[in-house]
């Protein structure tokens, strides 16, 4: 997040449009508490430098504002691309467990949503989500549900069309421990994505770099253009899916709402040290999968 003067001016303007009057803002935020009433919108500061704890409503509106700015910037680029390259699908890639903006708003502007799937990197990196014994158990295969959760979530953001934009092909360079996948996992991860409705699975990288920041990040080819371990598995999947009669997309057994504003509210004022909205919904998702139920993620706006 940015907290500069341009952000402050934009936030004040956004509040003025949202509430129309400062009295309406004071009522909505409950500013009578601690005598926090504003006389005009120019008195509102950003929530990061308040003398004491900021009003939770102040923070929540700031998150709403910054999320809308992300969506507006994306829309600006979408409009340019649609004008200069009409008739083509527009796609953008999201990430795992990123809650800083409402992905439904951005996804609605796209033809195809996608995300970057790094099963081993995410497992070892997200240590607050995965305890040590769990990380050791799945160190070379990735958490059994994390990828599926995001497949279903991002499928919901752009009316069912989605890709894996970056699929892990081997050890990465950015996790605490960059472990090689177990034999067969490259193929399994791709097949899992297709089973969740992916139109495409794209690997990052095609060829490993011999220099710079990501030179230790594996590709389907090594830097000398020889085949890395993942090359054969990716090729096998390509042959496999040519001969699979994929069923028509159907509704899941269960709908599960994922709400970004709820995630922000939990972050702003958690009622326990380890309260985390993502973890709550993820645990529910895990439980549904244990009962062999397919899950459709939904925005609260369409629930």
Residue ranges and their predicted role:
Residues 38-44, 118-121, 132, 136-303:
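Carbohydrate-binding surfaces of carbohydrate-active enzymes
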Residues 1-153:
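Polysaccharide-binding and catalytic clefts of secreted carbohydrate-active enzymes
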């Amino acid at each position: 997040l940015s907290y500069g003067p341009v952000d402050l001016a934009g936030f004040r303007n956004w509040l003025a449009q949202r509430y129309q009057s400062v009295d309406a803002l004071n009522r909505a935020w409950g500013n009578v508490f601690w005598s926090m009433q504003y006389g005009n919108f120019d008195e509102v500061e950003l929530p990061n430098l308040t003398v004491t704890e900021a009003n939770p409503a102040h923070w929540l509106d700031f998150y709403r504002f910054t999320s809308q700015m992300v969506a507006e910037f994306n829309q600006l680029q979408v409009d340019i691309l649609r004008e200069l390259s009409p008739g083509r699908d527009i796609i953008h890639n999201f990430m795992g467990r990123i809650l800083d903006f409402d992905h439904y708003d951005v996804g609605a502007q796209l033809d195809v949503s996608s995300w970057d799937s790094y099963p081993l990197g995410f497992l070892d990196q997200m240590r607050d989500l995965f305890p040590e014994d769990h990380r050791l158990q799945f160190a070379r295969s990735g958490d059994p549900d994390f990828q599926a959760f995001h497949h279903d979530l991002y499928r919901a953001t752009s009316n069912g069309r989605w890709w894996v934009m970056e699929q892990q092909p081997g050890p990465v360079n950015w996790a605490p421990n960059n472990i090689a996948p177990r034999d067969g996992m490259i193929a399994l991860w791709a097949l899992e994505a297709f089973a969740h409705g992916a139109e495409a699975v794209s690997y990052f990288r095609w060829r490993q770099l011999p220099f710079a920041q990501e030179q230790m990040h594996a590709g389907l080819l090594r830097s000398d253009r020889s085949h890395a371990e993942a090359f054969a598995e990716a090729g096998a999947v390509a042959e496999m899916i040519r001969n699979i009669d994929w069923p028509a997309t159907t509704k899941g057994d269960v709908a599960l709402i994922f709400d970004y504003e709820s995630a922000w509210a939990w972050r702003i004022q958690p009622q326990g040290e380890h309260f985390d909205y993502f973890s709550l919904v993820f645990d529910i998702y895990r439980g549904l999968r244990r009962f062999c139920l397919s899950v459709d993620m939904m925005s609260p706006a369409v629930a």
